[in-house]
């Protein structure tokens, strides 16, 4: 049995909940996981390679879990990135230790400057490159290795 970070629970998502979250949280950074519509978002949310940690402050999504790697997305209800730095690090440490990950990556729209600075300066992600013509324009790919957290 895998133990979760103490402040989280695994999110449960049915069709109605997925549609509600898609509508309610459209403005949250990273919430839509690079998906173009609610149908695509729903497929990601119920995929066996996705783990969604839910808490009172928001969500942490680990998607594309395979071969010791995953893509991580953070969505905070209050939008206060710096308030959640330690919780974000704890979730990443949990995924690396309990899920056996050695690398997590984040894909962030290039226009989200504050989110990119937070990932790099506070969490420790390293910028790897630009994904051109990603879902809605260019995106930045960042990564964090187990020994860097």
Residue ranges and their predicted role:
Residues 65-79:
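Conserved acetyl-CoA binding element of GNAT-fold acetyltransferases
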Residues 1-36:
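Short amphipathic alpha-helix that is part of the acyltransferase structural core
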Residues 81-97, 117:
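Conserved acetyl-CoA-binding loop-helix of GNAT-fold acetyltransferases
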Residues 119-130:
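Conserved acetyl-CoA-binding loop of GNAT-fold acetyltransferases
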Residues 133-149:
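C-terminal "cap" of GNAT-fold acetyltransferases
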Residues 105-117, 133-135:
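Conserved beta-strand-loop-alpha-helix junction that forms the acyl-donor binding cleft
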Residues 39-49, 58-68, 131:
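A conserved beta-strand-loop-helix scaffold within acyl/acetyltransferase catalytic domains
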């Amino acid at each position: 049995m895998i133990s979760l970070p103490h402040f989280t629970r695994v999110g449960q998502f049915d069709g109605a909940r997925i549609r509600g979250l898609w509508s309610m949280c459209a403005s949250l950074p990273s919430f839509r996981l690079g998906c173009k519509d609610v149908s695509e978002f729903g497929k990601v949310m119920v995929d066996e390679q996705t783990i969604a940690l839910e808490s009172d402050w928001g969500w942490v999504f680990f998607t594309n879990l395979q071969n010791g790697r995953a893509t991580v997305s953070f969505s905070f209800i209050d939008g206060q990135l710096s308030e959640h730095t330690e919780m974000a690090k704890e979730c990443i440490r949990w995924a690396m230790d309990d899920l056996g990950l050695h690398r997590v990556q984040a894909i962030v729209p290039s226009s989200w400057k504050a989110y990119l600075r937070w990932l790099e300066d506070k969490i420790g992600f390293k910028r790897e490159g630009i994904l051109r013509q990603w879902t809605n324009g260019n995106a930045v790919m960042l990564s964090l290795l187990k020994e860097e957290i």
